[in-house]
Amino acid sequence: MASEGTSWGAEDIGAQGDQVQHSEEQVDNYAHDSLASGDADAADNGTEDDGGEYDPESVTIGTPAMVPEPASSGTQRQTSKPKMSGGFIVEASDDEDEDEDEDEDEDEDEQPASAVPQTDAVSTQNHPGPSTTSDEHVPAAPTHAPVPPAVPSNVTPVLPGFGPVDLLEFRVKEDPRGDMDAWQELIASHRDFSPLEKARSTYNRFVEIFPQAADKWVEWIELELKYNNFVEVEQLFGRCLMQVPNVKLWTVYLDYIRRRNDLNNDPSGQARRTVTQSYEFVIDNIGVDRDSGNIWQQYVQFVKNGPGQIDGTDWQDRQKMDQLRGIYRRAVAVPMSTVNNLWKEYDQFEMGLNKMTGRKFIQERSPVYMSAKSANIALDNITRHLDRTNLPRLPPAPGFNGDQEFRDQVEMWKKWIAWEKEDPLVLKSDEPKAYNQRVLHVYKQALMALRFWPEIWVDAAEWCFQNDIRENDKEMGTELLVEGIKANRESVLLALKHADHIEVNYPDKEVDKAEFAQAVRKPYDDVLETLYEMGDKVKEREKLEISTLKQAAAQDPVQTSIEENDDDEDNTPKRSPTEERILAIQKGYAAETQLLSRTISYVWIALARAMRRIQGKGSQAEGGLRKVFTDARQKGRLTSDVYVAVALLESVVYKDPVGAKIFERGARLFPNDEMFMIEYLKYLHSKDDTTNARVVFETCINRLVSNPDTLAKAKLLYAYFHKYESQYGELSQISKLEDRMAELFPEDPKLKSFVDRFSTEKFDPIATPIIISKTAQMRPKQIVPVVQHQHQQSISLRNSPMPVRQEQNPRPQYVRATASPKRPLAVDDEELNPPKRLARGASPLKGAAGRRLDQQRRNQASALHRDITFLLNILPSSQSYDAQRFNSAALVSILRDTEIPDFATLKAAGGGQPRFGNPTHTRQPSGEFVNRPLSPYGRMSAAAGGYRNSPLRPETGNAYQSNPYPPPEASGQQPTWPQAPGGYGAPAPGQFGGYRY
């Protein structure tokens, strides 16, 4: 092992820097496998017998059979060839230099011939010819294939022959599931301007990809009905009717049945019986839909127009009444928009026959109707913003346009499904079949809109498994999984769920394990095949886009400046705009390829674990874990995760030393993958092989540090090894390691390495503070945030001189004068000398309201909202206000301490007169004060002044004398009499700035 680690520096350079074993790693596979019998075997002397019969180094990886070898004639490029990018034609170039450029790019990519054919024929796969494409490669009606089939390289489109329809054909072939707009335009064009056979072919291709698109089925059926093609119409109904629970489609079916069965010329009654059976068939399948109200009403009207009288006594009449009663009783139990009208009709129907029995029937069905009515209101609220479309679209990628709107629609569908599962109509216990029908129906409605959302397929299948839902003796859950996989061939979730269901419920597991393993493996193989096709498609798109960009750059060259720029300190060569765009394209496709490779790798890991459970370790030929690992290496496009998972399975489950060889193999394939190296180090440490672990660490670190591009990857390796040395190593080794880390990563805090010695994922004894004094260290934070600018501004306002108080205007002062005869309090009277409260009667809040208020006072005050605290903080100090301030506490005290007698006492005292009486003043006030109440200080007699006799002063009763002085505000003039001495007769000054309360 130690010597093996030292040999990594001499390994192939092509393997370095690659962390994905796809087409590039296949070159390494061939190189390393060719060395397996030479250098690798020589390095493994003494350990060859440990592997037993299985040696991963001896696996022969042949050329994948799925990719054909390119024909020699296909390597010759055409001098003028149109290019396609995103469904649009890019003008071809006659320059021959692009051939050499693309050949150089292909050599740089190091693509083996077995993985990607070194020919430009792949670039024509995205842009097939108009009609010269052979049926062998491009089928006329692809079945739910997300990736268009390959096009022969000898097919060269001719530019003059292209039209709008041809461009639409290219768009739908390039993106069959995503370009819904192109599909609709293409269908409309063929329907309106092409022969019927062409329109049929287009419709057929569309419904194979979107089999639940009810609107397109209706268009196709109406097109056939336009030409009276009844045989084709019935065939279409047989294909779509049971698969598409759409009200519009089933309504078209009813119209067709009524059209084909003439009720006016029906002496035998066979036509009416056929229509009746059709209505029952439709009601049984689509009658639970909340939009099926019109079908119910049409059925009722159809029965009413039939033979017989509703109030008759003949057997036919009674049969008609029983039929109508049955329809009504079923219809009023369905939550739909017409349930209220149907209930009114049912009420009139029953009461018109017999009021006694009618009331009985109405009372029996009334609870069901009320439940349906309330459920309809609830459904209106749930589905108010729901888009019940049957033309599904691919879900937008997270963070892109339409992502949030699509997820909102998904949540609405989930809310509707959850509402149906809660059983608001109370059907689960009494009518379980009706309950299952309703839930399954809403699942089917959701699948019509969310066809490309795998989660909804799995959710529906899981519910069917739990409730044992079957249709036509078929397990509905399995059918949903199969249909979901057809709609989403690349979905790993659906493939894993289907394989898991097969593994759990396979009938004869012990009889034939090979057949059992093949049944479980089929979903894995299908999704892997789709993912590999998508990976090839990504590579082809990348080459096509780069070649198109080079053609455009060659046709429009940009002259670069040759002047020296003094601002450029370094002498690094500048890239042209074309090179920058090519680099950006390569980075984008590299990220997409990496994502596909990781997905493929984890599917292989899941398959390896499943086969190990079924067939055990197995062998390279018979099956099991090792067979899966061999197949995965042959297919390629693997990440290091596959090697880690298989090596750990061999080591942990079977205690086989082959796991170490797999790790060694992965270390040569992924020398710059820091995560793989960490797993390798963990494995060696688990085996107490510290010597080889240190060799592996040093070898990988030296390789990563030598390249500035991979220097950042070394930090994770250093962190892991430093943690291991901190726990089990010597202090000298720890110090040396920390010095090396500080030298390589000077931007990291030096204290961090020291702290990492003693911390774990659960606890950090150094960073966690120790509380010494709760008083000093655990003070609660202030609720009101301090804003520095406003705080300084308020301080400056408080320190600045206050403005001079202005004199009060006499007229507003009179308006603000209080009508209370009680003496106003001074400014600080309440604060210094609180008023004595007189004993009062029982408070009206002694009951529950009082207890609630008392509880609120006892509870701790809640923190104010952030915006409120900010507003309170920026308000100026109260000292900056110049206007008179309102003392709310004094007003509340007056209202609280004032005792108001009852009306009898008030009337006996002479009060109760209206306040708006004729004044006794000799002159009328100005027009502004004509309709205001009289001033309590005006000249009026004791008998005429109701307010003067008010018992607000019970100590004197009605013995008050009139005020001998009119207020100066009443006359609008300055007083001519001398000011009365201070005392009871003089009016008191305003409580706050002259205001009276």
Swiss-Prot record:
The protein's GO terms of the molecular function aspect are: mRNA binding
Q: Where is this region: Disordered?
A: 1-152, 549-579, 792-854, 907-997
Sequence ranges of Acidic residues compositional bias: 46-56, 92-111
Superkingdom as given in the UniProt entry: Eukaryota
State where composition is biased (Polar residues).
72-82, 116-133
Gene3D superfamilies under this entry? 1.25.40.1040
Entries under SUPFAM superfamilies matching the protein: TPR-like
Respond yes or no to whether keyword Repeat is given for this record.
Answer: yes
User: What Gene Ontology cellular component terms go with this record?
Assistant: cytoplasm; nucleus
User: Which keywords appear in this protein's UniProt record, sorted alphabetically?
Assistant: Cytoplasm, mRNA processing, Nucleus, Repeat
Any GO BP: mRNA 3'-end processing
Compartments it resides in:
Nucleus; Cytoplasm
Question: What Pfam families does the record tag this protein with?
Answer: Suf (PF05843)
In the record for this protein, the HAT repeats are positioned at 194-226, 228-259, 270-305, 319-352, 389-422, 434-466, 654-686
Bias type Low complexity, positions: 32-44
Q: What does this protein do?
A: Component of the cleavage factor IA (CFIA) complex, which is involved in the endonucleolytic cleavage during polyadenylation-dependent pre-mRNA 3'-end formation.
Question: Under what name is this protein listed?
Answer: mRNA 3'-end-processing protein RNA14
Q: Which organism is it from?
A: Gibberella zeae (strain ATCC MYA-4620 / CBS 123657 / FGSC 9075 / NRRL 31084 / PH-1)
Q: Highest lineage ranks of the organism? A: Eukaryota, Fungi, Dikarya, Ascomycota, Pezizomycotina
User: What gene name is listed for this protein?
Assistant: RNA14
